[in-house]
Amino acid sequence: MKRRDALKIMGAGVASVFMLNIAPKTHAAILKDREKSKKRLVFYFTATGNSLFIAKQFSDAPLSIPQELKKGNLIYEADEIGFVFPDYAASAPMIVREFIEKAQFKADYIFSVITFGNASVNVAEWWNNFAKGHGLNNNYVNSILMVDNYLPVFDMNEQMKIDKKTDENIATIISDIIARKDFIAPSDMGWFTEDMLKNMQDMHFSQKCNQLIKLDTGRCIECSTCIDVCPRGNFSLTPEGLEYDGKCEFCLACIQNCPQHALSLERERNKDARYRHPDVSLNEIKRANKQ
């Protein structure tokens, strides 16, 4: 065989291996590669896994806000800092607010991604203003539509049937953050008014868990799941059985993750339907929230 022919065969072989084994990187992979060269910290709060799933698109090791709050020195510095959390009544969960109030952050680029299930309304603007009031200046705030896990209003079985185009939307957000885009999502109030939102927030954040959550003692097997997933540590096992008290985050992690459906709200759209993101395990939520 002539040398030139041998080189042609070798070149074809190398090309075929290259084509078989080297696939274009996803946006998430590119972002994680940059995480290795630049220091990026991503903080999240989750109850059913939506926000944790999104946080994992930006970091291989996102940091749980309930766990970070246990630490004494809440001072963070990085090239990029991100926050991922759910929209609660067009605002942030109280535990996220508490973290922002207590911690200090320094970064060249700060981004926030807020998960929601029905209408984002003015949550990006609200969060940007709240954060700015506590010395945190966002370069980028956007929201992403996912399964709505708010049990009083939505049937989880019906929600899971809806294609909310999460993959396409997260790809856009990742592209924005790779480019370090400056963007604050505009408000879309729809039929909501400021007074309506204030009433919703007052109702949502004033709950005590022993008034809100109902326990079916016949179903409860004292498995401790509710204890492990509650970010406020409101549940405990006593000789008399499961007890719970304290100010409720109203995240519904206890109800959604109970394997026996022993916990519920007084009013739900479908008490037989529960939700956890399919790519997030119960153990991940326990590790994120256990007090």
Regions found by a protein language model. Give the residues of each.
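Flanking helices and flexible, charged tails adjoining ferredoxin-like Fe-S electron-transfer domains
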Residues: 28, 250-291
